[in-house]
C-alpha cells in the first residue's frame, strides 16, 4: 500500500474593519483596518472605539495626540507606503501617511520611529487631507 501525500493548508481569516474619522467642519476620513500585519494592535484599536483625540501634522503625515490604545511594537516597520495607517507605540498615536515625511529620503515615507501598520486610508483625496491643521479634534468610530 502506497502512502498518499496530502497538502494541508492552514487558512487564516483576515479581519477588516471600516473606520470613520469624524472631524468637525472638515470632510470625514475613511480608513480600513486589517489585522494581517499587526493583529493585536488592530484588536486593541477596535476595542477602544469610539475615541476622540487631537490631530497634528508632520510633513505629509497626520498623527494624533496620545490615544487610548496601549500596544508594544508588533511587526513594526521603519518605512511605510503611501496611504498607510499605523500605530506609533512610542507616542501611543495613530498615524495617517499621505506623502513624504521630513526625515524620509526621496520617494520614501519614513516615520519618526518604527510603527505598527494597521490599515489604509480609503477616502478622501490628498487635497482634503492637506486641509487638516494642528489641534483639530477627531473622533474615531466604526463606520455605520
What does each of the following model-derived ranges do?
Residues 3-48, 52:
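Start-of-domain signal
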Amino acid at each position: 500500500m502506497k502512502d498518499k501525500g496530502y497538502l494541508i493548508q492552514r487558512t487564516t481569516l483576515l479581519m477588516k474593519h471600516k473606520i470613520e474619522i469624524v472631524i468637525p467642519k472638515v470632510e470625514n476620513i475613511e480608513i480600513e483596518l486589517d489585522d494581517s500585519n499587526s493583529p493585536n494592535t488592530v484588536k486593541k484599536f477596535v476595542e477602544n472605539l469610539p475615541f476622540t483625540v487631537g490631530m497634528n501634522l508632520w510633513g505629509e503625515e497626520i498623527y494624533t495626540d496620545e490615544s487610548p490604545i496601549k500596544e508594544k511594537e508588533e511587526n513594526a516597520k521603519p518605512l511605510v507606503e503611501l496611504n498607510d495607517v499605523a500605530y506609533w507605540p512610542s507616542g501611543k498615536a495613530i498615524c495617517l501617511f499621505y506623502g513624504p515625511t521630513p526625515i524620509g529620503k526621496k520617494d520614501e515615507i519614513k516615520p519618526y520611529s518604527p510603527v505598527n501598520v494597521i490599515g489604509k486610508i480609503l477616502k478622501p483625496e490628498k487635497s482634503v487631507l492637506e486641509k487638516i491643521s494642528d489641534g483639530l479634534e477627531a473622533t474615531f468610530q466604526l463606520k455605520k
